[in-house]
Amino acid sequence: MESTLSDLSGVPDTTFAGALKQTITDNLSAHNRIDSTNDTLRKASVGIIVVENDKGAAGFILTRRGKGLRNHSYQYALPGGRIDHGETREETVLREINEEIGITVSKDQILGCLDEYETRSGCSITPVVLWVNDLSSLEAEPGEVEEIFIIDIEELFRADSPKWVSIEESNLKVLQLPIRNRLIHAPTAALLLQFKEVALLGNFMRTDHIEEPVWAWK
């Protein structure tokens, strides 16, 4: 299924070898990010990993969680996991990226962080944005990851995206991001939408108004 892209005028050049890395770095540095104040939530961090696709443009890594996982199995997700005692969010995401998809990433490849997102299932997730050149060791850990996808960044600028859906269970609207022939929901969709608006476009945006689908609340 072909993607329908919106008018890309005003969108930063997504050539991987261009100025995009500096644009993202500058925009994240200027963003006044917020952390959750709810100490009862489990802390986690995930990686929004910017990589080069087969056309020389920038993409990001999306995974499909393993079928055998106890929580949120077979859902689309960003690589990451729960922050262990004594770890920083950055240390967690570097460890989880290596464990889940085989890439060894260093702290100097981190461009910055976005807002923490509180989930209905009791987590507070920090998205960490990274720039990775070497994908030679990219490989799914069979117990945790079913599939790995490299998604063109331009997918975030589709004319049919984002979609907002009203539900009876909440006053907030559920976010859907059409990516390829799939619909990605919050929390992953919330993190990617803020990445688009803040890191790529330099706009102001929070994520606390974004609802998850009811099936993700558990």
Where are these regions (language model features)?
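NUDIX/MutT-family hydrolases
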Residues: 140-179, 214
